[in-house]
Amino acid sequence: YKRQVVTLDEDDNIRQFIPGSKFSYKKKTEYFKTVNIYKFSREFSRTHYVPFLTAYSKALGNNEYYEQVLRVIALLDKPEIKALRLGGEAWYEIDDIQDLDIAASIFTPDREEHLRLMESRYGGYWRYPRIRDFCYLVNPYFPNKRLMSELKANFERLVREYPSGMRVNSLLAAKYFGISQEYICIGNGAAELIKALMSRLEGKMGVIYPTFEEYPNRVKPDMVVPFHTASRNFTYTADDLMEFFSGKDIGTLLLVNPGNPSGFFLPKGDVLRLCLWTKTRGIRLIVDESFVDFSCGMPDNTLLKDGILEEYPHLAVVKSISKSYGVPGLRLGILASADRELAAWIKKDVSIWNINSIAEFYMQIFGKYEQSYVRACNRFMKERDRFMQELSRVPFLNVFPSQANYFMCEVKPPMKARSLTGLLLKNHSILVKDCSRKKGFEGREFIRIAVRDATDNDALVRAMHAETGSEPSSTCPTNGESPFSSCSTSAS
């Protein structure tokens, strides 16, 4: 679309060459991107292309794209220029260093290098329209179309206006979650708040492995006291944690609940027991509940209540809005604590304009869509149950039950997690998370698979079976289409 697109008739004759200045995003489904490969017959060159090229260069000079000549020829009654539609072949147009970087990640022949280049991007996969991203974790059923339409309707003004500062946005976040404004901090994603919080902590930190490593990576390795459950299913109880950490000198205990990547959910009653236990021992408790809205009984599982925060002022609750609310591109997260000194310090530590106007507007209007969000989460849970049944039929996978929007899967011999991840990407354009190198999985092979909508989930199941020659129990539509169809052109 950057240089030239065309429109076709039912016989694949090119009707128009559309230059960039005439490109309309409203008509993008009608366009085909040219791959800049042309075959001209001698007769076409003699009767059409060379005469028009000569006249065009005399009139407008030589500093023009050759396709401008084809654009003029296409206006004739019988231009005799046909297109050949590509059938899924990989191609990429390279005009600058960004294009070169993307093309390198697409066309490298080495499977491991292909995977490494894709993983190292940490997102931005809209640049790869055929990729199905099962690596990063969002809600496939929210936001709904009406909310997205409201964002789009206000997009131009929001882009041109400054966002509010921390005070106003903390008020919005407080309204969003129904807690006091002085207890809550809003961040440019939870990652910004995690960084600020970890720099504030004193003493060693107890960490339950495997975990979301953004937390322990923010402290020195010798300041981490690791807990490894004896359960091969990576489950544990509040009693297990209290017994283990009772004899340890820690200033902070981290609980990611549901666990990432395990998906294990410690019941709220056990979490409240941990709140009391840490309070009596002067231990800061951090609970990351970014995925709690995907847990069964979700409205009652959160700790984001004024009463809970006030009873346990040593408690800090972190929540990523990106995950369960399906808006990772907006970069929103919150931290809540009745420790007013901590909350005030974090608000000063981050930038006053740490979220943009579009993210602020989303927070402003969310209340109108709260019931739609609850329905989306309930719909998600049903699809998660169905998806688990399908994944469980894959011969080389052991799927762990999950209360989050992903499954942790053990990869059984002779398959390896790394090779499976590479095969899915190279052969099926599916990206999953290779967890084989994560701490806590030593000696075992694991991947993490996001739960997406039914069409994508079934595509992944089919791809898994294709790598073993086994048969899936159900079928679904084939690979998704690129935003622009592709074609090469020829003239007779």
Predicted features and spans:
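Conserved core of the sugar-phosphate nucleotidyltransferase
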Residues: 2-60
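Conserved PLP-anchoring active-site segment centered on the Schiff-base-forming lysine
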Residues: 198-218
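Active-site phosphate-binding strand-loop segment of PLP-dependent enzymes
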Residues: 232-298
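PLP-dependent enzyme catalytic core of the Aspartate aminotransferase-like
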Residues: 143, 426-427, 438-492
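Short loop-beta-helix segment that forms the pyridoxal 5′-phosphate
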Residues: 162-163, 174-196
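Conserved PLP-binding catalytic core of the aspartate aminotransferase-like
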Residues: 380-381, 394-428, 451
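PLP-dependent aminotransferase class I/II
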Residues: 32, 165, 314-400
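N-terminal "arm"/small-domain region of PLP-dependent enzymes with the aminotransferase-like
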Residues: 106-161, 248-249
